[in-house]
Amino acid sequence: MLTEDEKQLIQHVWEKVLGHQEDFGAEALERMFTVYPSTKTYFPHFDLHHDSEQIRHHGKKVVSALGDAVRHMDNLSATLSELSNLHAYNLRVDPVNFKLLSHCFQVVLGAHLGREYTPQVQVAYDKFLAAVSAVLAEKYR
């Protein structure tokens, strides 16, 4: 459960993500593919090379979905329901991958925000992304 202070931190930091969604998303995906190579199996038709247009496009979609979640933190289940259905029933993505990508996204935030990525921000984003991952995995039960 996010506190009001954590929600404000998440929204404040998200303002710094805006305008960089494609870059941050692509970097998070590239990190995930490098650190967790098994995740590549879900993207057999993608060009997985650095800065590929497919990775950039998908990265932007991922970060846009996170932006929706940031705007609707108090109603994540409804906000992410369609995405949860897609990943559970159509794509059949192992839900552990949501946690892996969440971790990589936090690394990207830390790398780009530097000192602004305080321990408090990290805790808030860790809790927020864990909640997003849990909602995306709801349909698997």
Swiss-Prot record:
Give one Pfam family, short name only. Globin
Q: Does the keyword Heme apply?
A: yes
One Gene Ontology cellular component = hemoglobin complex
* Annotated TM spans: none
Coiled coil start-end: none
- The Globin domain covers 1-141
Q: Which tissues is it found in, per the record?
A: Red blood cells.
Task: Output the superkingdom of the source species.
Answer: Eukaryota
Under the heading PROSITE patterns, the entry gives: GLOBIN
InterPro entries, alphabetized: Globin, Globin-like_sf, Globin/Proto, Hemoglobin_a-typ, Hemoglobin_oxygen_transport
What keywords appear on the UniProt entry?
A: Heme, Iron, Metal-binding, Oxygen transport, Transport
Gene Ontology MF annotations: haptoglobin binding; heme binding; metal ion binding; organic acid binding; oxygen binding; oxygen carrier activity; peroxidase activity
GO process terms (BP): hydrogen peroxide catabolic process
- The entry's heme b-binding residues are H58, H87
| Alphabetized SUPFAM superfamilies for the sequence | Globin-like
Query: What is the annotated quaternary arrangement, including any partners?
Result: Heterotetramer of two alpha-D chains and two beta chains.
Q: What does this protein do?
A: Involved in oxygen transport from the lung to the various peripheral tissues.
**Family, per entry:** Belongs to the globin family.
Tell me the protein's name.
Hemoglobin subunit alpha-D
Organism annotation: Chelonoidis carbonarius
State which gene encodes it.
HBAD
